[in-house]
Structure formats: C-alpha cells, structure tokens
C-alpha cells in the first residue's frame, strides 16, 4: 500500500496497529497537511508502542501533544485514560528536555508547550517563552505560532504580528487566521490586512476563518453586505462541522433579503447547530415554533436551552398535589405487580413447553406460536411496568399546561403530521398527566390506548384462539384430562392478565406521587428547575 496517497481518515482508522500509517500521519502533521480540526480525531493514545517511539523521535511527541491539546485541554473525550497518559508524559518530559538542550528545534517547541500547559511538569510560562523563542528563531513555524499566541494573550500585538507573519510565511494557515484576529485588535484596526489573512486561511480550509468571513459579509462589517459571499463561506465552514457556521447558514436561508431564502433549509440548519449547543440557534427555533404554534417543539428547545421563563408561560406547577392517601395500598399494588407478572409469565411458558414437547398433533406448532406471541405481550407489559416505576419524565401530575388549548394544539399537530410530540398531556381516570420526551410520549400513547380498550384485543384474541384450538383437539385426542388441565391454565392466565392490566393502571394513578418526587429531585433535568423558586 502506498500510504502517501491514502486518505487521512483511512490512515486514522489504520493507525492503531499500523506503524506505516502512524508514520504517514506524523509526517503530514509536521508539514501542516493535517487540518487542525482533525487533530481530535487522530487520538494517538491508542497507537501501539507510541510512548516508546516518543523517546526516540520528537515528531511523535509533537503529535502526542497536539492530540493532548485537542482532546484533553478541550475536554472532547473524557473516556481516554487521562491518568495513564499524564504518567507517560511525566516520564517523557526529561527526555524532551534533554533533546531540547541538544538543540533539537522541534523538541524545544515541544518543551515550551509542556511548560506552558503544565504537561508532565509544573506550569512555567517564562520557561515556555524561552524555549519557544529558541525554536522560533531557528525558523520552526509551530514555535513561531506559539510565540505569536503568547504575545497575543499579553496584548503585545505588534510582536504577535511579527511572529505570526513568520509562521504564515512557512505555510502554517492558522497563523494567517491569528494575523487577521490580531490586525483587528490594533488600536487602529487594519481591516484590509485582516480580511486578506482571513481569505488566505479560509482558502487553505480553515473553517474558523471561513466562519469569520461569512459573518463579515453577512453583517456588512468592514465591507458591503454580500449574502452570496456569506452563503459561500458559511457553507464551506459548515461542511467541516462548524456549528457556528451552520447557524450562520441558517440565517442566510432565513433572511428575506437573500436570494437563498428557504425557510425549511434555515430550520434544518438551526436544528443542526442547536443540537451542538448553539444557544442562538436554539432561541431561533423557540421563536419559530412559537410563531407557528408548534408548542411541543418549542418547549423541547426551551428545555435544551434552559429557558425556564419561557416554559413558565405554557406549563404551570400544580401546587396542591395530594400525596397518596393510601401508602399501604400503593405498596400492595407494587408487590402484586411483581408477583402476578412472574406468575403469568410462568403460566405462558408452561403452555409453550406443553405444546412443544407433550402435544404432537398437527396444530401444536400453531399453539406454540400463539403462546410465544402471548409471551411477548406479557414481557412488554412487564417492561411497561418497569418504565412506569423508574422513568421520572412520564405521566406526571405535578405539572400541567396553563391553557388546555396548548394540549389541543399538540394533539392536532400530531394528528395532522403523524409526528410524536416532545410533550403531551393525557387523561386517565379523570386525572391529567403530562409526559416529556418523544419516546416516553409514544409509550404513554400505547399504554393509554390499552386503558381505553383500543389494543386490548391482541392478547385476548390470542387466548380465545388457544381455547378454540384445544376444544378442537378434544375431538381427536384421548387425553381429555390433560386438555382440561391446559384449558383451566388458559382461563387462569386470562384472569391473571386482566388483573395485571388493572394493577398496571393502578400504578399509573397511585405511582404518580413517586414519579413526581423523582422528577422534582432530578436536578439534571432542566424542567425540574421550575421548582427552584
């Protein structure tokens, strides 16, 4: 395989156990062919024999530090074993220090970064600056960039520009981006140089520069407003995963002044950006769904953005929530659910065994399938019970819609679109219960259908078919006592399933106080913040 022509993503996939893939990634990073945004994907911490290679090759140390910066310092992937990595870096530090003292230019830059971030040693900014300077003065673009960034943070912009320019001349595109940022920080901003350097970086694929250009053309900063240019740069940046640009692209689509106006495309862009946590995209969606009377989606984005004040306009706390008046009965319901659930499952499985291994008539296999279908229904009921007892976001009575028309609107939207809403209020036994999360709403829709008798027929019909099948068996079998025994088992099973369903309905009614408590105590869920006051 010619690794020099392999796509970077493929190299990343191969690198864990492939030395040649590792070498190619390292070389590409050293010459700046790997975009900064991909560093977090490389994750060399899993590479075979990585730390042994770091002892002898400063390039591997550089890659390790780049990954450390992208993953650990940005807190991208907490699953990576930080403690082990830090131990290894502490062991590597004296090796890097010795290599730097031996005038290895890349090691000097590596050591500067380790001092700057406190990697394998204490943070020592002055030493970091010293080693960066030694490396930068020998022409290493990474060190020149790091030194430029050091002066940028110190607000020494003239010195910062000097080092960013040197780094940019070596082809390091991030230096062009930082040059642009620095020109705008000057006491008299140099807009022309800023835009020039944004363009240089953007044309090399720097998505942050592409985003900045999109904003400049969209807002008409330093140049005339140009929606087509804004669209171009936002789209290029968004394709690389920049969710700020995704929001910007949405704004272009949403603008009535733009030839690209497309409301649905705008909403799709806002959703992508909002799902990455962009607060303004979330607010745009709240505004859009409120105007269009899609109350459930509006509340979803209110929850995502912690907009409790907006939620309070639609959902209220029910202050006078009674605690269950019969704790003993509630405990009995819970115990009976467990006992009856185990019993009906046992009876159903007993019928399966009977028809698989005892009865040998022509339709025994048909009865097995009926029993297995019934078994799946019983298991579903048991799973429902577990959800009712452990999910704190469904069938709550502590909250309700301020205006019943909100729930009517949600039901109408579900009926016309077929889409499950994020929040919905159901009525059961003349009481109102509210549920959050689409999966939960779908579940509650199903269970409420059973309480209304809509889906009750599924298990009931299976039992009737079983009874009929056994009655036909009596005409051909001599073992009538065994048949009667199975028929009694079926009758008992029917009675017990009815009892289990009734107990499950009691769980909805009497278990609500437990669900309310779990909901209010769940401080990680933004809706629970309604109770903060």
From Swiss-Prot:
SMART domains: SEL1. This is Putative sel1-like repeat-containing protein L21. InterPro entries: Sel1-like (IPR006597), Sel1_AlgK (IPR050767), TPR-like_helical_dom_sf (IPR011990). Keywords: Repeat. Gene3D superfamilies: Tetratricopeptide repeat domain. The keyword Repeat applies. It comes from Acanthamoeba polyphaga mimivirus. Pfam families: Sel1 (PF08238). Sel1-like repeats lie at residues 105-140, 141-172, 173-206, 207-242, 243-278.
């Amino acid at each position: 395989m010619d690794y020099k022509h392999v796509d970077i993503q493929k190299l990343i996939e191969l690198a864990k156990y492939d030395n040649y893939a590792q070498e190619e990634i390292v070389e590409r990073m050293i010459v700046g062919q790997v975009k900064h945004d991909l560093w977090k994907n490389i994750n060399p911490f899993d590479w075979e024999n990585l730390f042994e290679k770091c002892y002898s090759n400063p390039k591997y140390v550089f890659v390790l530090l780049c990954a450390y910066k992208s993953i650990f310092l940005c807190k991208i992937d907490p699953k990576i074993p930080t403690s082990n990595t830090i131990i290894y870096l502490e062991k590597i530090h004296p090796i890097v220090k010795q290599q730097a003292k031996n005038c290895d230019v890349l090691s000097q830059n590596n050591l500067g970064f380790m001092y700057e971030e406190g990697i394998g040693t204490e943070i020592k900014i002055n030493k970091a600056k010293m080693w960066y300077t030694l490396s930068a003065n020998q022409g290493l673009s990474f060190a020149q960039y790091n030194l430029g960034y050091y002066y940028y943070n110190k607000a020494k912009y003239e010195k910062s520009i000097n080092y960013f320019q040197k780094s940019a001349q070596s082809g390091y595109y991030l230096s062009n981006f930082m040059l642009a940022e620095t020109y705008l920080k000057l006491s008299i901003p140099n807009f022309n140089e800023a835009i020039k350097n944004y363009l240089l970086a953007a044309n090399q694929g720097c998505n942050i520069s592409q985003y900045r250009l999109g904003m400049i053309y969209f807002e008409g900063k330093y140049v005339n407003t140009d929606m087509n240019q804004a669209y171009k740069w936002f789209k290029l940046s968004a394709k690389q995963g920049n969710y700020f640009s995704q929001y910007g692209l949405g704004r272009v689509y949403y603008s009535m002044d733009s030839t690209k106006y497309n409301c649905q495309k705008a909403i799709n862009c806002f959703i992508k950006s909002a799902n990455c946590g962009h607060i303004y995209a979330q607010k745009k969606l709240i505004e859009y769904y409120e105007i269009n009377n899609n109350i459930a989606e509006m509340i979803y984005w209110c929850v995502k953005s912690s907009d409790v004040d907006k939620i309070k306009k639609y959902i209220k706390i029910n202050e006078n929530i009674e605690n269950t008046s019969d704790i003993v009965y509630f405990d009995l319901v819970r115990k009976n659910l467990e006992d009856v659930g185990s019993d009906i499952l046992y009876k159903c499985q007993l019928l399966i065994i009977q028809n698989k291994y005892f009865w040998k008539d022509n339709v025994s296999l048909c009865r097995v399938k009926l029993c297995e279908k019934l078994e799946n229904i019983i298991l579903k009921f048991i799973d429902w019970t577990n959800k009712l007892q452990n999910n704190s976001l469904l069938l709550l009575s502590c909250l309700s819609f301020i205006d019943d028309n909100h729930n009517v609107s949600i039901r109408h939207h579900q009926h016309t679109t077929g889409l499950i809403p994020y929040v919905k209020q159901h009525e059961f036994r003349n009481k109102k219960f509210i549920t959050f999360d689409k999966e939960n709403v779908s579940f509650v829709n199903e269970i409420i259908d059973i309480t209304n008798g809509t889906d009750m027929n599924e298990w009931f019909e299976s039992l009737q078919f079983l009874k009929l099948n056994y009655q036909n068996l009596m005409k051909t079998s001599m073992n009538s006592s065994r048949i009667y025994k199975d028929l009694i088992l079926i009758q008992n099973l029917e009675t017990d399933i009815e009892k289990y369903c009734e107990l499950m309905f009691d769980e909805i009614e009497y278990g609500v106080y437990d669900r309310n408590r779990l909901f209010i105590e769940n401080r990680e869920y933004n809706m629970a913040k309604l109770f903060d006051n």
